[in-house]
A protein has these predicted regions:
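Long, intrinsically disordered low-complexity tandem-repeat segments
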Residues: 144-187
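Cofactor-binding active-site loop characterized by glycine-rich and histidine/acidic residues
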Residues: 54
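Histidine-centered catalytic micro-motifs
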Residues: 17-21, 77-82, 246-255
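Terminal accessory/targeting
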Residues: 8, 13-18, 324, 328
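Electropositive, surface-exposed helix/loop patches at the edges of structured domains
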Residues: 77-87, 132-146, 211-213, 292, ...
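Active-site proximal loops enriched in glycine and acidic residues that flank catalytic Cys/His/Asp
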Residues: 218, 251-253, 275
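C-terminal alpha-helical cap/extension of soluble enzyme domains
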Residues: 256-333
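Alpha/beta enzyme core
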Residues: 3-12, 24-49, 58-71, 82-150, ...
Length: 333
């Protein structure tokens, strides 16, 4: 089936699952999971994925698109966490229908200016654009839109003058940062109420930038490996009432099923998931290699890993599709 515009897949009361892919096996697993669930899905290629592939967007985009087009599922192709305009400007020609431009590490006024310019370019080239406001935290790979000397720490930057460390460094002159949304001496981390998206500011941001969707900070964090995050459901309700575009939840791997379903019921339209799939994938690889340490053919461990990821995708899509259903005690557990 041809790629589908992401906007046509968003429906009130159902969370649209958006899954990050790193390899061909990831893309195959996500699409297989969507087919099994009978639900639409988003294949997401992040800026970090592009870095992993040597900075070359087109090969991984073409591979993901080919997998989607060979499927019976409705699939959108989305470029996630774009941190510079040069990569954004490759998106339309590479087959993407949408992108997420991430200038959230900049001070508010600069975030607005950079995002407004990105949205103008995207709309002129037929792209749907998502942006972020607030501190979700946990992103690896650097700060948004070259924020050296700004307020957010990079994953590989030097700590000169920085007040808060990241996983591998902080921003020169920066006051907050880190792959874990660290708080040492700086800005509160992603789980702190002070880091969350303000509804009034969110409305101003959307109005000023013209974006098509907004990723909001409501208590989740990227790269969590335990499902212990507690979302600010009241804030989601207020954001949904204030903002006229779909809301997006990033860092959803650490959010329990019941919390995800509540979030969808309260107004989250798109749910980004990556780490949970990597846990399923690498767990299956470890299990296969532990059972047969002498195996040398990568297909012997990649096939079960792909199957495990597909099962995780199908399950999570089912969770998100039930966002408008009355919750039970089982869901809340």
């Amino acid at each position: 089936m041809p790629l589908v515009p992401i906007g046509t897949l968003i429906r009130p009361g159902r969370g649209l699952g958006a899954f990050n892919v790193v390899s061909l096996e990831h893309a195959e697993a996500v699409v297989a999971g969507a087919e099994a669930a009978g639900l639409p899905v988003v294949l997401q290629i992040s800026h970090n994925c592009v870095r992993f592939h040597g900075g070359r967007l087109r090969p991984v985009a073409r591979a993901a698109a080919a997998v989607a087009e060979g499927s019976t599922a409705r699939v959108a192709l989305h470029l996630d966490h774009v941190e510079d305009e040069a990569l954004l400007h490759q998106a339309a020609d590479a087959g993407f229908g949408s992108a997420m431009f991430d200038a959230s590490g900049l001070p508010y006024a600069r975030n607005v200016a950079a995002t407004r310019a990105a949205a103008g370019w995207a709309h002129a080239h037929g792209l749907w654009l998502e942006a972020e406001l607030g501190e979700v935290g946990g992103k690896a790979g650097g700060t948004a839109v070259g924020a050296a000397g700004g307020t957010a720490g990079g994953a590989a930057g030097g700590a000169a003058g920085g007040a808060a460390g990241g996983a591998a460094g902080g921003a020169a002159g920066g006051t907050a940062g880190g792959v874990a949304g660290g708080t040492a001496g700086g800005t509160p981390g992603a789980h702190s109420p002070q880091a969350r998206t303000d509804p009034a500011q969110a409305l101003d941001f959307v109005t000023a930038t013209g974006v098509d969707a907004l990723a909001v900070a409501v208590g989740s964090t990227h790269a969590m490996t335990t499902r212990t995050a507690e979302l600010d459901q009241d804030l989601i309700v207020r954001l949904h009432a204030a903002v006229p575009v779909p809301l997006v939840l990033h860092g959803s791997s650490g959010v329990p099923d019941g919390e995800l379903r509540r979030a969808v019921r309260h107004g989250i339209a798109k749910v980004n998931i990556g780490t949970a799939l990597n846990l399923a994938f690498t767990g299956a690889v470890r299990q296969r290699l532990a059972a047969d340490p002498a195996v040398t053919d990568p297909r012997r461990y990649l096939a079960p890993a792909r199957d495990a990821m597909a099962a995780a995708v199908a399950r999570l899509l089912g969770v998100l599709a039930l966002g408008d259903r009355d919750l039970t005690e089982h869901d809340i557990a």
